[in-house]
A protein has these predicted regions:
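Short gly/acidic/polar-rich coil/turn motifs that serve as flexible hinges in modular proteins
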Residues: 30-31, 132
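N-terminal export/targeting and maturation segments
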Residues: 111-142, 146-148
């Protein structure tokens, strides 16, 4: 089994229009403003102002970042890209197997929101997830793997992509295979 180590959601695309994600600090995709995000998370390490969007970047180490995109015309959080590409504690990156790893079997979902954005805890559809999250956890919560739009297999120590679907909504995710076989 693989972990989802990143989420990228763009509410301006038809696939992301119905996705509302709650982040720590009371920030919600498609509802919160840039000012609310800066108040909740502090100043970003980078702020880019494009033609249609203001993009804030928060970094929490190598391959661990959150980008929040706010529509210039509304000031509302319209896009998010979270990546937490790290090995979970005690995990050795090593081959492809259909057997769930010990880390997948021992994953415990958070019971509530994280305290800070760098906790990588999100709430979606009434469920809390802490990235990286096993794909199987999303499947247990009603998400279905779209095999046609997902990598067939991800070799150990490598990254791949999966598409999960639920109630007509698509979630595109980056996965990392932490298995040893």
């Amino acid at each position: 089994d693989c972990y989802i180590a990143g989420l990228q959601i763009d509410s301006s695309a038809s696939e992301g229009a119905g996705i509302y994600v709650d982040l720590p600090g009371g920030i919600t995709l498609q509802k919160s403003t840039l000012e609310e995000a800066v108040k909740a998370y502090g100043e970003p390490v980078d702020r880019f102002e494009g033609e249609k969007e203001v993009l804030l970047t928060y970094e929490y180490g190598m391959y661990r970042s959150v980008q929040l995109g706010f529509a210039k015309d509304t000031g509302i959080l319209a896009r998010m890209d979270m990546k937490n590409m790290r090995n979970t504690e005690g995990m050795d990156v090593a081959s492809v197997s259909s057997n769930p790893t010990e880390e997948v079997q021992n994953y415990t979902a958070p019971e509530g929101p994280g305290d800070v954005l760098g906790d990588f805890v999100v709430e979606y559809d009434g469920q809390f997830y802490q990235l990286p999250t096993p794909v199987a956890v999303f499947e247990k919560n009603g998400w279905v793997l779209n095999e046609a739009e997902s990598d067939y297999a991800v070799m150990y120590g490598k990254y791949g992509c999966v598409t999960l679907e639920k109630n007509g909504v698509k979630l595109y995710a980056v996965v990392n295979n932490y298995g040893e076989e």
